[in-house]
Amino acid sequence: MKRIITVIALMMSALASAFAQNGQIVDDNWLTENYTRREVMIEMRDGKHIYTAIYEPVQQYLEKLGKKAGPIMLFRTPYGLKPYGLKPGQIETEGKVEKYPGGMKGDMANYAAEGWIIVQQNVRGKFLSEGEYENMRPYVSGPDGAADTVVVKGVVQVDDATDVYDSIEWLLKNTKNNGNVGVKGVSYPGFYTTLAALSRHPAIKAASPQAPATDWFMGDDAHHNGALCLADACRFGSSFYRHRPCPSTERLGSILKIDKDLYEFYLGRPLKELDAFLGDSLRFWNQMMEHPDYDRFWKDRDPSAHLKNIKIPMLVTGGFYDAEDCYGAFRTYEMLKTMSPDCELYLAAGPWYHGGWNNRTANHLADVWYGEKSGAYYQDDVEFPFFSYYLEGKGVKPVRVNVCPSGESMRSVM
């Protein structure tokens, strides 16, 4: 059965405030009082350890909510998760912190206010996580998911599905949870959310890939309809694609030094001359140059081709003005609709830039006004109720929603 949630702009002026949906203000002081942070290095099946920050509600707050335990909300990312308390070489640290990541007070605030366990994890090879980072690592686990370990020529095969599977196994055994896991993320984390669904871990009850990086040749990030996007591929890649020689908490800076206008810089030389500026240190840049056509290299990195017989509910979210991953959201939705007829499939789309729905006060794009707090509406009335229903059995089953341009008339239909 298909369900579509379409959030089409010009939102109502009186939507959710900066409070969490249950009225709780989630800030550093509140989090320090009601949550603890544990940092651990979770061992994967090939022996590598993945940095994981676990935010858990204190028992008193759970009792206040009338709960014995809450679900786990998992967020996996290649970007920094400061503040880091764990040092390279340490396995675990625990305690309270005075300053929490912005996401805990932003798009995760509703989950924190309801006593959920919030888990933030650096993917393999990024920051403190061990192993080699591979951009858009190909899915190798197969149609049955990542439960079984595959060994080829003595080497344990891993991908982002096996890593999320192993992480959830550890989390279920080492946190006080209700046995249910949700996964969400925007952009790269959207890609990892798709791979989480492909892991087919039985504890994952719902997932929301949002602007998921999906097909890096046909429409996402580095290419748009096969045309190389230099802003993403070159400038962004000049720092992000850099090899991290050992785990560390520091962001690697750009190796590209440009002392003039970017537009002029790109127009003033053929593509091959960029190698002189980038050197030979960016493995993925070199791979892009070696694969200028839509070949197996790119197709292997598209997880949407594997979205067959997905059983868990999926909320796919995208923005009409997303310059990075507009393609990925609608491609993911299309493939799920085509290949997973039993998936309870939802779509949320609006007039947002890349990840704009995570900005609670989002109300415009440049000079185009599209209404008050559309991000807050999405978080409070679309995303959180979706996960709350499937992970805690609260609320009503999501239905198709149309928001009229004036915001004065709203109707729900099956």
Question: Which residues fall in each region the model found?
Answer:
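Alpha/beta-hydrolase-fold serine-hydrolase catalytic core, especially in secreted/extracellular enzymes
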Residues: 23-38, 43-48, 202, 246, ...
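Alpha/beta-hydrolase fold nucleophile elbow
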Residues: 175-187
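Accessory cap/linker subdomain of secreted extracellular hydrolases
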Residues: 82, 94-97, 101-107, 113, ...
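Cap/lid segment of the alpha/beta-hydrolase catalytic domain
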Residues: 64-173, 359-370
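A short loop-to-beta-strand scaffold at the N-terminal edge of the catalytic core in hydrolase folds
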Residues: 46-64
